[in-house]
A protein has these predicted regions:
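Intrinsically disordered, low-complexity, basic-enriched segments
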Residues: 2-110
Length: 110
């Protein structure tokens, strides 16, 4: 597969995961697509980005019930600090699988 095809596949995978992440608007805008392309060019793996979505969504959903509600995530850029955080982690994929299972217990926020 050529690099163009690989980038398109990466962008599609990342944007589809972003669209389905709890707490997001569920829509994709041009800046989101451009940022996904930049992440590909940086060499960030799609799995890393998906893990960042899971980590951020888990944090948002597993907050105290007394905490004020959070606004809707409107941009892929919201996740950049979490992507960088995930890049620096040295944890097993089991950790992210555990978070995914916890997220499945929460009702959809969209």
């Amino acid at each position: 597969m050529d690099d163009d095809s690989l980038q398109k596949e990466f962008v599609h995978r990342v944007l589809e995961a972003y669209r389905k992440t709890p707490g997001t608007m569920g829509t994709i805008r041009r800046p989101d697509r451009l940022l996904a392309q930049q992440l590909y060019q940086r060499g960030v793996s799609a799995t890393t980005v998906e893990n960042a979505f899971v980590r951020a969504a888990a944090r948002r959903l597993m907050r105290s019930t007394d905490a004020p509600p959070l606004g809707t995530i409107r941009s892929l850029a919201y996740f950049l600090p979490v992507i960088d955080e995930v890049l620096g982690l040295s944890v097993s994929q089991d950790y992210f699988q555990h978070l995914r299972q916890k997220l499945q217990r929460f009702p959809s926020t969209r």
